Amino acid sequence: MSPPAAVSPTTRSVELAAPAVKLPVGLSKNNTTATIEEMEGKWDDFKFAPIRESQVSRAMTRRYFQDLDNYAESDIVIIGAGSCGLSAAYILGKKRPDLRIAIIEASVSPGGGAWLGGQLFSAMVMRKPADAFLREVGVPYEDEGNYVVVKHAALFTSTIMSKVLQLPNIKLFNATCVEDLITRPSEEGVRISGVVTNWTLVSMHHDDQSCMDPNTINAPLVISTTGHDGPMGAFSVKRLVSMQRIEKLGGMRGLDMNVAEDAIVKGTREIVPGLIVGGMELSEVDGANRMGPTFGAMALSGLKAAEEALKIFDIRKKQNAF
């Protein structure tokens, strides 16, 4: 005899009155943030929305590793997030939203030397016509005739950085350094086809730790704007010498603002196939003068680097298929 079939009891929905809950100041009923005006004067009752520590960990980790995956194959890699690199990124990201652009910056704080003017002073001086770029990104300045003055260099750097980071096709990997260049054989000898990366803190300890291999990013085009010679500066061009792609560096000459800025902007170019060099790193290749605390050439060298990149990108992309 078969067991009796189970019969579900008749159910009817019952609406239960939700107990009244006193919402903390700062949250509305649908968990949206209150306005500042609603919070003012009510700090004794203030409370943040609840969170579990693992939620924070997963929110950061998931997004960062997704970025690593997305940008493992980039269209353009920019080494160095100083004024030149950020200016190049801004133009590229704006003109070509279809390109995937990775910026690699060794420091925790991007911006290079553009947070202050000369001798740790605040004001930033740019010679005309670099004021055109300030107007483009919305940085106010005082007009002094042949040059303009931004009241604090950090105003320029924070503004251009905010513009760049809001572009959906650009990812900044800071606290990350480039340890080497990826190369491919080509008719011209060697073509640059990406970068070798590592955490900066790891790179600083290769002498006292072992087995700390790097990561890689493939890209048909690299723009190097790492600054003049230093611990991380002029990295790419120094590596070209050790790879025997260029014979030697010209070495940066003494300070001459009038000569230096024109030379840097005019000289910004593809040094070897797949590698464009701009900013003060270029002075180490060409033996150009240093310019000191005037920043117009850094911004406009970035603009020219972006322009040069767009001229040759399609060619380098075809070459980089394998």
From Swiss-Prot:
One CC-aspect GO term: nucleus
UniProt catalytic activity: [ADP-thiazole synthase]-L-cysteine + glycine + NAD(+) = [ADP-thiazole synthase]-dehydroalanine + ADP-5-ethyl-4-methylthiazole-2-carboxylate + nicotinamide + 3 H2O + 2 H(+)
Entry superkingdom: Eukaryota
Function per UniProt: Involved in biosynthesis of the thiamine precursor thiazole. Catalyzes the conversion of NAD and glycine to adenosine diphosphate 5-(2-hydroxyethyl)-4-methylthiazole-2-carboxylic acid (ADT), an adenylated thiazole intermediate. The reaction includes an iron-dependent sulfide transfer from a conserved cysteine residue of the protein to a thiazole intermediate. The enzyme can only undergo a single turnover, which suggests it is a suicide enzyme. May have additional roles in adaptation to various stress conditions and in DNA damage tolerance.
Biological processes per GO annotation: mitochondrial genome maintenance; thiamine biosynthetic process; thiazole biosynthetic process
Compartment(s): Cytoplasm; Nucleus
Lineage: Eukaryota, Fungi, Dikarya, Ascomycota, Pezizomycotina
Alphabetic keyword roster: Cytoplasm, Iron, Metal-binding, NAD, Nucleus, Thiamine biosynthesis, Transferase
Name of the molecule in the record: Thiamine thiazole synthase
